[in-house]
Amino acid sequence: ANFVKLTGKESTEKLRKEAVEIISHGNNVLRETKNVTEKVHALMPIVENVEKLAVKKIESIYGIQFQREVQYVLNRHRYIFDAFAQKDEIFYIFECKYVRNAISRERLRSVLEQMLRYKQMFKDQGIATKFIVAFVLDEFTENRQHEIMDFYSSVAPEMTVYVFDFNKLKVEFSTKS
């Protein structure tokens, strides 16, 4: 297939964009560029750790190994995914979204629209896919979990969505150095 591992520079840029997305959807209005840059650089390692832990959790659920940070090239367009696996002619596409505080409907809708575009692209190519989205909450509550799950079950019941507690993932997959 056309799936290729991201280079170090591409991976760093992906993490930077995700950190900016998290900040822009947060409750704080950021005014100073220096402040934004500092926050982005502080968030990047957290986002990377969240993705690693979420991929481990998804691997344990599905019993297959995922390759992290891959791109799919189609007609000179690059599509970047947090993780990818293939089993029995089905492509598993995984996207992880880290949520520090509350999550807005706008962000939920944005993730949904992105996944639906990807789904249509693969369908047009005749490729069987399973899309998995995981929201990893820094401040996990059952109300937030239900809010996310209810949104997706009402508008995209065919999409597989998980909501994980970041602290529980850290405990479950902690490694002794």
Specify the residue positions occupied by each region the protein language model found.
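Acidic-basic catalytic patches of nuclease active cores, encompassing PD-(D/E)XK
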Residues: 7-74
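Conserved beta-strand termini and adjacent loop/short-helix elements that scaffold enzyme active sites
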Residues: 69-71, 136, 162-166
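A short, glycine/Asx- and small/polar-enriched loop/turn
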Residues: 77-80
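Active-site beta-strand-loop-beta-strand hairpin of nuclease catalytic cores
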Residues: 82-94
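Short acidic-hydrophobic, aromatic-tinged amphipathic segments that line or gate anion-handling sites
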Residues: 156-171
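Short, surface-exposed amphipathic charged segments that create phosphate/polyanion-binding patches used
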Residues: 172-177
